Amino acid sequence: MKVLALRHSVAQIYADTQVYTHDDSKDDYENAFLISNLTTHNILYLNYSVKTLQILNKSGIAAIEIQKIDELFTLIRCNFTYDYIDDVVYLHDYSYYANNEIRTDQYWVTKTNIEDYLLPGWKLTYVGYNGSDTRGHYNFSFRCQNAATDDDVIIEYIYSNELDFQNFILKKIKERMTTSLPIARLSNRVFRDKLFKTLSVNHDKVVNVGPRNESMFTFLDHPSIKQFSNGPYLVKDTIKLKQERWLGKRLSQFDIGQYKNMLNVLTTLYQYYDMYHEKPIIYMIGSAPSYWIYDVKQYSDLKFETWDPLDTPYSNLHHKELFYINDVQKLKDNSILYIDIRTDRGNMDWKEWRKVVEGQTADNLHIAYKYLSTGKAKICCVKMTAMDVELPISAKLLHHPTTEIRSEFYLMMDIWDSKNIKRFIPKGVLYSYINNTITENVFIQQPFKLKTLKNEYVIALYALSNDLNNREDVVKLINNQKRALITVRINNTFKDEPKVGFKNIYDWTFLPTDFEMNGSIITSYDGCLGIFGLSISLASKPTGNNHLFILSGTDKYFKLDQFANHMSISRRSHQIRFSESATSYSGYIFRDLSNNNFNLIGTNVENSVSGHVYNALIYYRYNYSFDLKRWIYLHSTGKASIEGGKYYEHAPIELIYACRSAREFAKLQDDLTVLRYSNEIENYINKVYSITYADDPNYFIGIKFKNIPYKYNVKVPHLTFGVLNISEQMLPDAIAILKKFKNELFGMDITTSYTYMLSDEVYVANISGVLSTYFKIYNAFYKEQITFGQSRMFIPHVTLSFSNEKTVRIDTTKLYIDSIYLRKIKGDTVFDMTE
């Protein structure tokens, strides 16, 4: 949802839009909670409170002040990510398709012939890093830019088996126009930039597990971040290959040679970061014009020095000349060298051309070895061709996508590799490598071992759920890693499947109850965004590919109502209750009935079950930004930091009742996952709360009334307001609590409206209006370690007779309290108070 704050209402009516006017009788947190549970996508928030907007944004719900009608029109028609700290809106708006336009934020693409393969009459537009060049389109009171591009489609095409780009992009645009926006993926780039900048400032050592090509620009300015990936393809790994011949296959209709060069250099750069944790000088021989350098410089201040007879316009220092072996001495330490020398074929026949290519490859290797033979902190990536050759066994092979698969690949070596044992590699083996291998990642660092790191902050986004990892080791890492942000795939199956398929692999599934740690926040993508200064206009949908975000060691942990809070917890319930359910009271009725409370009069205002916990359990797939376990734990320890005003603390027994209702719901729905989740949350409640039951009571609290509107034959009809099991030494503490609640007890609005048989020969009158106070007193007794209340649900009633009688219904009648007392069962009254 998105909340657009206005000082005045607007005349125009928008689809899927609701107006909410700030309620001055409620505090900012309660207003935020009410807004978050509205069911429309667009909320026009009138007479707004800035504090309420802050609360929503911290909860991951985009809430923005609107000053102009143009701002309203722009934001209401598309989705966006909002940086609420810096007041920047990143639109995810593809309406530019209506201008016959596709967009990119990678400059090198604009220098290709891609426009020859677009839809007829269409063009390509460069929009800058995260759409920064579009800022001029929006003269708004906040900074606004459209981060939507088609780079995801272009890159997917490059790695696909499709050759016809026009058909490919047509299909993808049609898909985009007919499916839900994958907003988490679109906003992820904004999030990653913010995340790693924040963590790099706050932590000395940061470890990142499983980066992919989407992050290849993100880490350019973070050389100290340690990367773990799937490891490199080494020369010695070719021993498994059978020999093949030249294949010759076109991968792309438009020229992607620049993309290949960029990937080669970035792969080498990240290998240098991994070894030396600082930025090198980047030397490049050949590969002009290298327009992609412009892209790299949008993210970092890396320095390039280049040699090529052709221009390289974005190099810091370009030598418009050939590079010779003697020029190697000009290259400094703390550098990487990219060698991409290859003469144009011209009119040479293939045999003559082959000799030239192999000769140049030998020359390239000679330059590489000479560069690595002296000095320190150097890595080289050199262009190779399939030929009979000796290569160091520990050198890395690279074969990033290029326009055509022919004979070309690349070799990456550091100083140690260049001096390592060499092995003869036949030409046919190298063809086998070229024909069958595409390097899919610029990050080729070693795999991560699932062990805790003492001094590091560990980030593992979408990296650990793969069933190649041992599930128990993943859980152990999350439980024990003190500082981390780790995601795992949430179990939103209905049959409690332990693993689910994803693309061509399987992922383990997890629930919050699979982990045992305090001090960590378990939330959704949206909830995590709020913690890092971002919010989003479209909540994650339960697609089957959703992830828990687990933050350990965060200073936000105790701020219970600010981050990963209960906002939107009833939204799914409202959507169903007010559209397709039998009654809008269905949730209240079901919760009472499933706990054997059959007095449904006033069930919507006096419910005996925690609606928060019930909704968090049965609709966890729709809103798991609310960290239920943390909420339970912090209340059980009394350590919750509450910023808001009015805040109702549930009695632990209300939470137990909610689990029982959720369990009943799960059985009716045949939802095995909710069934397990409910059981495990109930077990967790019993673990963190020391709940004792007065199932063998020796005292009770009685309430005597001045008026009873029914016939009765008991001596003194009274409401048993709970039973206790206490020693005589605890009587003063129990009496003190009753005295403390005197005004609230006598202020209860108690009513009755019918009689019924509670059991055989127990004839009673119903009582309404006491549950809220009962649970407050329950909490007070619990905190003083006084055993109060039974294991079965408290059903307030007044016993009228110990015989079978017919039900009587009367108009709702108010009952007036005469006295409240504490009495020993089958004994004397030890305390009595009147108003």
From Swiss-Prot:
InterPro entries given in the database record: VP3_Rotav
Is Disulfide bond included in the keywords of this UniProt record? no
- EC number(s): the record gives 3.1.4.-, 2.7.7.50, 2.1.1.56
By its UniProt entry, which Pfam families does this protein fall under? Answer: Rotavirus_VP3
Biological process (GO) annotations held by this record are: symbiont-mediated suppression of host innate immune response; viral process
Q: Where do the segments described as 2'-5'-phosphodiesterase activity lie?
A: 693-835
Q: Where is the active site?
A: 718, 720, 797, 799
Region entry 2'-O-methyltransferase activity, spans: 246-428
Region GTase/RTPase activity: start and end of each range? 556-692
Task: Please write the reaction equations for the catalytic activity of this protein.
Answer: a 5'-end diphospho-ribonucleoside in mRNA + GTP + H(+) = a 5'-end (5'-triphosphoguanosine)-ribonucleoside in mRNA + diphosphate; a 5'-end (5'-triphosphoguanosine)-ribonucleoside in mRNA + S-adenosyl-L-methionine = a 5'-end (N(7)-methyl 5'-triphosphoguanosine)-ribonucleoside in mRNA + S-adenosyl-L-homocysteine; 5'-triphosphoadenylyl-(2'->5')-adenylyl-(2'->5')-adenosine + 2 H2O = 2 AMP + ATP + 2 H(+)
| One GO term describing the cellular component | viral nucleocapsid
Residues annotated as region N7-methyltransferase activity?
Answer: 171-245, 429-555
The Swiss-Prot or TrEMBL note on domains reads: Contains a bipartite N7-methyltransferase domain, a 2'-O-methyltransferase domain and a GTase/RTPase domain. The C-terminus contains a phosphodiesterase domain that degrades the 5'-triphosphorylated, 2'-5' linked adenylate oligomers produced by the host cell in response to IFN stimulation.
Described purpose of this protein according to its UniProt entry: Multifunctional enzyme involved in mRNA capping. Catalyzes the formation of the 5' cap structure on the viral plus-strand transcripts. Specifically binds to GTP and displays guanylyltransferase and methyltransferase activities. Has affinity for ssRNA but not for dsRNA. Capping activity is non-specific and caps RNAs that initiate with either a G or an A residue. Together with VP1 polymerase, forms a VP1-VP3 complex positioned near the channels situated at each of the five-fold vertices of the core.
- Family, per the entry? Belongs to the rotavirus VP3 family.
Q: What is the name listed in the Swiss-Prot or TrEMBL entry for this protein? A: Protein VP3
